[in-house]
Amino acid sequence: MKRYTVFGGRGFIGSEIVGMLEASGQDVWVPLRDDDSVFETDLGTVIYSAGQGDCKNSPFGVFDANCRLLADLLERGKFERLVYVSSTRVYMNHGSSSEEADLKVCTDDQRRLFNLTKLVSEELCLKSGRNVTIVRPSNVYGVALHSPLFLPAITRNAINHGKVDMYIDQDYAKDYVSVTDVARACITLATHPESVGQIINIAAGYNITAKQIADVLHKFTACEIVWHNIAFPNENFPQTAISKIISLIPDYQPRNVLEDIELMIAEFKAHLAAH
């Protein structure tokens, strides 16, 4: 039995990691926010999945969650390994998504603070002299039936209301990765000897457009898709490179979001029929 400490363990990604670790019989601690005992305790293997992205309404909260606590842990914490959960959003409007690619910050990005804090935290990890691994998940999705997340929510709307409102361009495309794939990869990389000091993308490896998602919803629910013409931010994402994670985890086979939407629709219909 290994000791794991999961910061952000009550959040979307963190709770999935905690569930998998507990299911395998590991000793897992999820500290409460502002618990100073984390600096006096042997944390074992740390997975840092805490974070915040509301740059408009809570800029200092974004900094605190993404940087401040992590910096204190790197400087004062007692741990063997640390996995820091960053984001492939740092590749937005770039030509490459290689982990070694040069990165830029876009002045017209209203959430650039998020990218900046992620990059600062990554650099602190690399400069800390500690045993760290940095992972960059793409757009993480879940399929929990009653989740407020984007995909389950629009699936419920398609079935319950026969209508889905889309406030993005039809050709808006990004990489979607299942939360189960992210959690499993984080746990594997946390003990992988060759992942120390590495930055590793966790993604499907291909982009999916909003229209592809809408087409699946329409095909299996016959719902109406309403596209709203709004001024959408300049967000273009290159295809995410996954060669590094495959080299480290040869059996890494990420789920397909379109297939998972189809499964979610079937599950939701079965749930309604049973109730």
Predicted segments — roles?
Residues 123-173, 179-181, 217:
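NAD(P)-dependent short-chain dehydrogenase/reductase
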Residues 35-76, 90:
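NAD(P)H-binding glycine-rich loop region in Rossmannoid oxidoreductase-like domains
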Residues 71-113:
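Conserved Rossmann-fold NAD(P)-dependent oxidoreductase catalytic core, especially the SDR/UDP-sugar
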Residues 167-169, 174-275:
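C-terminal substrate-binding subdomain of Rossmann-fold SDR/epimerase-dehydratase oxidoreductases
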Residues 7, 49, 82-88, 135-137:
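SDR active-site strand-loop-helix element
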Residues 53, 88-95, 138-141:
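Active-site segment of SDR-like NAD(P)-dependent oxidoreductases
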Residues 2-23:
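N-terminal Rossmann NAD(P)H-binding glycine-rich loop of SDR-like oxidoreductase domains
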Residues 63-64, 100-122, 148-152, 175-176, ...:
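Short-chain dehydrogenase/reductase
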